Design a protein with these regions (language model features):
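Pre-Walker A (pre-P-loop) alpha-helix and adjacent loop at the N terminus of AAA/AAA+ ATPase modules
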Residues: 8-53
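Conserved NTP-binding/hydrolysis module of P-loop NTPases
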Residues: 79-95
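Canonical AAA+ ATPase core
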Residues: 91-94, 117-128, 133-213
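Hydrophobic anchor at the beta1->P-loop junction of P-loop NTPases
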Residues: 47, 114-115
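Conserved alpha-helical scaffold flanking the Walker A/P-loop in AAA+ ATPase domains
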Residues: 34-37, 91-114
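Short loop/turn elements that form and flank the Walker-type P-loop nucleotide-binding site
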Residues: 33, 40-42, 66, 107-109, ...
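Walker A/P-loop
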Residues: 36-77, 89
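Residue-level signature of catalytic and energy-coupling elements of molecular machines
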Residues: 27, 47, 84, 129, ...
Length: 213
């Protein structure tokens, strides 16, 4: 996203993203509008909605339209804070290998970071993420790595209550919006999503979007 735009240009830019996204993601006009607002305001978002309503695809589409990079991490009870910063492994020669994790992999190009089922991760992971959200940086590899364009989207597992760690009110206050993603009520839209072959391969759907300038 270019920074040197007039207010009118930003408005046109936002409207164009919404228009393009609505051609790809059906029945989510309100959610798309709110997500675009949050991205332009650099405000983090809690997403509400069941499994399979298309949250991942929606965020991938929006990321492609605005330009920048997308990363996702899955919340589990085994996830540790370091897991989202770096990966440690042993290479073929038996030597340790350290690589950047999902939060740092794309560096300053990271636009959208999706934390799926955040309430399944431990509070220590929440603390690290909330600090990165506030400071827009992470200290790792003996230096500060800045994430100036990162907007965090997170959703919660609202079905399983075992081994979940709900966000306290103070943590939820770090999110600018809570946006509901629901299955479209219009039967024609639902039929199109289910039966139109264009929407069956979501990876191709996202890949075919032209890269934003």
């Amino acid at each position: 996203m270019k920074e040197n735009k007039s207010l009118q240009e930003w408005l046109g830019y936002a409207e164009q993203i919404q228009e393009d996204a609505n051609k790809i993601i059906l029945g989510q006009e309100k959610a798309i509008k709110l997500i675009v607002i949050s991205l332009l305001a650099r405000g983090h978002v809690l997403l509400e909605g069941g499994v399979g309503v298309g949250k991942t695809t929606l965020l991938q589409v929006i990321t492609k339209l605005i330009g920048g990079e997308y990363e996702r991490v899955e919340g589990t009870v085994d996830l540790m804070p370091n897991d989202i910063i770096y990966h440690a492994s042993i290479n073929a020669e038996g030597k340790p290998n350290i690589s950047k994790g999902p939060l740092l992999k794309k560096g300053e190009d990271l636009s959208v970071f999706f934390f799926n089922e955040i309430n399944r991760a431990r509070p220590q992971v929440h603390s690290l993420l909330l600090r990165a959200m506030t400071e827009k940086s992470i200290s790792a590899f003996n230096k500060d790595i800045y994430l100036p364009n990162m907007v965090v989207f997170a959703d919660r597992n609202q079905v399983e209550k075992n081994e979940t760690f709900e966000l306290p009110a103070a943590a939820r206050d770090r999110f600018m919006m809570e946006i509901s993603i629901e299955t479209p009520k219009d039967k024609a839209l639902r039929d199109s999503i289910i039966f139109n072959s264009r929407f069956q391969d979501t990876s191709k759907l996202v890949k075919d979007i032209p890269i934003a300038n």
